[in-house]
C-alpha cells in the first residue's frame, strides 16, 4: 500500500489507534519499516484515558492550523489523559525501551502457554500475537496469515461460544 501511495503521489496514512505505543515504541510502522505521512494514535497512548493524536511532518500538520482544515475531536487534550500519556511514555522508554521488551515477552509467553493448553486439551485453537497483542482463533491451520485463510477456515461460532464463556468468567479480550 505504501509503495502505491508513493507511486501515485498520495499521502500514506497509517491508523495505529490499536497498535501504536503497544507493539513497539514506533508501532507497526517501526516493526515493518513503514514510513507513513500521517499516523493516528489512541487506546494504548492514553492507558485507558480518552486521548488520541495525529502525527506527521510539519508541512502536512501545518494544514491543521486554525482556519485551514476543519478538525474536530472528542479526545483533544484532556489533562488527566495527557498526564497518563506522559507518564506511560516516560516509563516505557526507560532503559532503552525496556517496558516494551517486557510486555512483548509477556505477550509471547501468554500466546505460547495458551497454545500449549489448547494442544494439551485437543482444541484446534491457535493464539497468534505481535508483542503484547494476541488473539485466539479456532482453525486447523498452524497460523492465519491472510484474510482469505481467516474467512475460509476460522470457526466463528466456536470463537463466539469461547468468548462468551470467557466473559462469564470475567476475562475480556
Task: Enumerate the language-model features and the residues they cover.
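Conserved N-terminal phosphate-binding loop of PLP-dependent enzymes in the Aspartate aminotransferase
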Residues: 1-173
Amino acid at each position: 500500500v505504501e509503495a502505491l501511495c508513493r507511486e501515485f503521489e498520495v499521502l500514506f496514512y497509517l491508523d495505529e489507534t490499536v497498535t501504536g505505543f503497544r507493539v513497539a515504541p514506533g508501532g507497526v510502522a517501526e516493526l515493518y519499516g513503514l514510513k507513513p505521512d500521517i499516523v493516528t494514535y489512541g487506546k494504548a497512548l492514553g492507558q485507558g484515558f480518552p486521548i488520541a493524536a495525529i502525527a506527521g511532518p510539519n508541512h502536512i500538520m501545518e494544514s491543521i492550523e486554525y482556519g485551514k482544515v476543519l478538525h474536530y475531536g472528542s479526545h483533544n487534550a484532556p489533562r488527566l489523559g495527557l498526564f497518563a500519556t506522559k507518564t506511560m511514555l516516560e516509563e516505557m522508554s526507560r532503559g532503552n525501551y525496556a517496558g516494551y521488551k517486557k510486555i512483548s515477552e509477556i505477550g509471547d509467553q501468554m500466546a505460547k502457554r495458551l497454545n500449549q493448553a489448547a494442544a494439551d486439551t485437543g482444541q484446534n485453537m491457535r493464539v497468534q500475537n505481535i508483542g503484547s497483542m494476541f488473539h485466539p482463533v479456532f482453525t486447523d491451520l498452524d497460523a492465519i496469515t491472510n484474510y482469505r485463510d481467516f474467512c475460509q477456515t476460522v470457526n466463528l461460532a466456536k470463537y463466539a461460544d469461547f468468548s462468551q464463556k470467557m466473559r462469564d468468567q470475567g476475562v475480556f479480550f
